Regions:
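Short, acidic, Ser/Thr-enriched surface-loop or helix-capping motifs
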Residues: 19, 92-93
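Short, surface-exposed coil-to-beta transition loops
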Residues: 52-55, 69, 82-88
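A solvent-exposed, acidic/Ser-Thr-rich amphipathic alpha-helical stretch
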Residues: 11-64
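Short, aromatic-enriched amphipathic alpha-helices that serve as compact interaction elements
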Residues: 1-10, 17
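A short hydrophobic beta-strand element
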Residues: 63-72
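Low-complexity, intrinsically disordered terminal/linker segments enriched in charged
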Residues: 102-130
Length: 130
């Protein structure tokens, strides 16, 4: 449901899926420390851009924890496009609400720095840390 909300730019039940005191951490450092802030972020972010793809590749669930692997792409109103692979680590309450969600990102433009030498050859580009 959370992924669908981003794709449709509609709050389809943020109050129903997150606890009041949820802690939501994005892969690049922002952290939202309650449901009202998550709701504000969702609404505000969607005025600046749109999520065009958020595809679930696979997920694993055990007890109160779910790990979701996904591919994400957005298009911002200023013309910037971002895309990357990621993982969400989700912790659930006994009544099936999200109490913690941490995102981890991975660049798509991967390469082997040892492909041509025993010494690493790194690209001369700014690293995108998630």
């Amino acid at each position: 449901l959370w992924f669908e909300m981003w794709l449709t730019k509609q709050d389809l039940g943020i109050d129903n899926i997150f606890t009041e005191d949820v802690i939501y951490t994005e892969s690049w450092s922002p952290q939202y420390n309650n449901r009202q802030i998550v709701k504000h972020w969702f609404q505000e972010w969607n005025t600046r851009g749109k999520v065009v793809v958020w595809e679930i590749k696979q997920f694993f669930h055990k007890e109160n924890t779910t790990i979701v692997e996904w591919y994400f792409k957005n298009e911002m109103n200023n013309g910037n496009i971002e895309e990357f692979d990621g993982i969400s680590l989700v912790e659930w309450t006994k009544d099936d609400k999200i109490k913690s969600l941490k995102e981890f990102g991975c660049n798509l433009n991967n390469y082997n720095p040892y492909e041509h030498s025993d010494q690493p050859e790194f690209r001369e580009e700014r690293a995108r840390w998630f």
